[in-house]
């Protein structure tokens, strides 16, 4: 399940950037916008479902850091929401660059939290998890 989660969020980030850049300020949406946005939503849903499943498994094992897991879950849900809001603002031709960079910053924070959690590579490297 962890591999599905990692694959889905990597593809979601790539699709988010592609979808965001497929909206021109002068010409509007490109013909590829709608399919990209739908595929992005699919991968965001896969990311949320697999992340929730990993959260449940970690809570059941008992040895996990529950506060960091909950914080990462909240950051992940916020990332999904900010992705949708920044794309919607861009689609309506509103100022969306600030929202885009806030989303990117929150993606990085969420990734750092994922790296230091018990299933992350830092914990596996030092034998903590």
From Swiss-Prot:
Swiss-Prot/TrEMBL keywords: Cell membrane, Membrane, Transmembrane, Transmembrane helix
Task: Spell out the coiled coil positions from the record.
Answer: none
The cellular location(s) given in this protein's UniProt record come to: Cell membrane
* InterPro entries documented for this protein: UPF0344 (IPR010899)
Report the principal subcellular site.
Answer: membrane
Topology versus the membrane: Multi-pass membrane protein
Keyword Membrane attached: yes
The regions listed as transmembrane in this protein's record are 1-21, 36-56, 67-87, 99-119
* Gene Ontology CC entries for this record: plasma membrane
Q: To which protein family does this belong?
A: Belongs to the UPF0344 family.
Q: What is this protein called?
A: UPF0344 protein SAOUHSC_00907
């Amino acid at each position: 399940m962890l591999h599905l989660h990692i694959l889905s969020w990597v593809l979601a980030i790539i699709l988010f950037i592609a979808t965001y850049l497929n909206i021109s300020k002068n010409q509007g949406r490109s013909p590829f916008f709608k399919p990209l946005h739908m595929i992005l939503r699919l991968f965001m849903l896969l990311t949320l479902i697999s992340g929730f499943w990993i959260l449940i498994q970690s809570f059941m094992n008992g040895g996990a850091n529950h506060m960091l897991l909950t914080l990462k879950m909240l950051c992940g849900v916020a990332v999904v929401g900010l992705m949708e809001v920044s794309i919607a603002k861009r689609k309506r031709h509103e100022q969306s660059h600030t929202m885009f960079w806030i989303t990117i910053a929150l993606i990085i924070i969420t990734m750092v939290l994922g790296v230091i959690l018990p299933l992350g590579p830092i914990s596996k490297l030092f034998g903590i998890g």
